Amino acid sequence: MSKSPVAIIILDGFGKRAETVGNAVAQANKPNFDRYWANFPHGELKAAGLDVGLPEGQMGNSEVGHTNIGAGRIVYQSLTRIDKAIEEGEFQENKALNNAFTHTKENNSDLHLFGLLSDGGVHSHINHLVALLETAKDKGVKNVYIHAFLDGRDVAPQSSLEYLETLQKAISDLNYGAIATVSGRFYAMDRDKRWERVEKAYKAIVNAEGEKFEDPIELVKASYANDKNDEFVVPAIITKDGKPVATVKDNDAVIFFNFRPDRAIQLSNAFTDKEWDHFDRGANHPKNIKFVTMTLYNPSIDAEVAFEPIEMKNVIGEVLSNEGLSQLRIAETEKYPHVTFFMNGGRNEEFPGENRILINSPKVETYDLQPEMSAYEVTDALVEDIKNDKHDAIILNFANPDMVGHSGMLEPTIKAIEAVDENLGRVVDLILEKGGSAIIFADHGNSETMSTPEGKPHTAHTTVPVPVIVTKKGVTLREGGRLADVAPTMLDLLGVKKPAEMTGESLIQK
């Protein structure tokens, strides 16, 4: 039977900004997007700050965006939740955190804090690290060591010195704690199974393998002199009196304070997996460690979780499933967790009637080297699916504007957007031919701002609104929409009643 599918099409990191300088979205030749914008109802959505459950003025990101999109309601994000717990004293009494503290006291061992050192608020926040230091000291933990992962991606490419100085000031004010290793997130926070990167971070933390420096500031300066910005700092060791400050040993405790799961999973696995074949962990692989993660990274990780997920009922996948509608989730590797796990409110398993297609992202060092990424392959698979009338609802993510946008390079990002536009045309025209409709929008901004006012590369997300197009004639879109309104709009287009839990509203004016 012929289907008229309704699709959610996410152009990841494709924000809306009037200024054209440094704006890859404005400068790209995108005839398909422009044609839909000219011919169909369109507007903009808020995708940052309070509108997605983040602190005011905080830029959106893919995890938060997809969670809000799938939930059809504003979802209180981990960042806000942990901030609130610190403020209200719950953090200090958190069971999992206290179990880590107790473990070190019972074993006369050390506590190690892993995580991304910045205030980017995408994967972590430096305030949470400082709160952990204060709490561990209050609770009588003898020694605490920090394994700092440098950012340079959700914040400026060379901003780690200020975060290291903030951390060193906290250490000095508390007279407690020390930095043991420093690593760029490229190594410690890989998510694409490039195990040789993770291995470098792991071996620095466990074996003190890597270049040695007495001062983390000197380490970073040496890296800059070597043309390696924060993200790419090779894992290195901090020494005192010629000896490594600390390594993770048997009976120690680890708290991984990143709250966003996807880039914390692989390193966590390296420490906790019983069965392991990705690289040789060596004779020093620590035994009997207490491993605590700030949030649930993956149910398969043998760790205690400080902030368990809040279960969400009636997310878009569940509603479609309960209505007996078939649904497809499709993306390449980099955004596959977003259209599945995050879209399903932190649930890994498929709902009945939900199918998934994963297309591998290209194995290149950085995506500016291949700006089209796997957009053509994703589209080939989807076109085949639509032609065969497989699904009533489709959730598609094009990763390119975001992943190439993170390079801070304008030209490759323009190419990325042009590749996406070509493929967007193939998908949407086919959906329209089938009598279906699409909601085309972004989860957050990025590629519309590729340079700072000073003309330096801008690699982070932004707080700008995102464009939205609903490819249905004869309807009007209301103003003031946000990401939480997308799922109700999809249900509206499918003729399905919105459940009470979805507090977002359809964008289509009644």
From Swiss-Prot:
GO cellular component: cytosol
Keyword Manganese in annotation: yes
Cofactor(s) for this UniProt protein: Mn(2+)
Any GO BP: glucose catabolic process
Swiss-Prot/TrEMBL keywords: Glycolysis, Isomerase, Manganese, Metal-binding
InterPro entries in alphabetical order: Alkaline_phosphatase_core_sf, BPG-indep_PGM_N, Metalloenzyme, PGAM_B_sf, Pgm_bpd_ind
Intrachain disulfide bonds: none
Top-tier EC class: isomerase
Cited CDD domains: iPGM
Tree of life domain: Bacteria
Active-site residues from the entry: 62 (phosphoserine intermediate)
Chain's role: Catalyzes the interconversion of 2-phosphoglycerate and 3-phosphoglycerate.
Subunit structure: Monomer.
PANTHER family, alphabetized: 2,3-BISPHOSPHOGLYCERATE-INDEPENDENT PHOSPHOGLYCERATE MUTASE
Protein name, entry field: 2,3-bisphosphoglycerate-independent phosphoglycerate mutase
Source organism of the structure: Listeria monocytogenes serotype 4b (strain F2365)
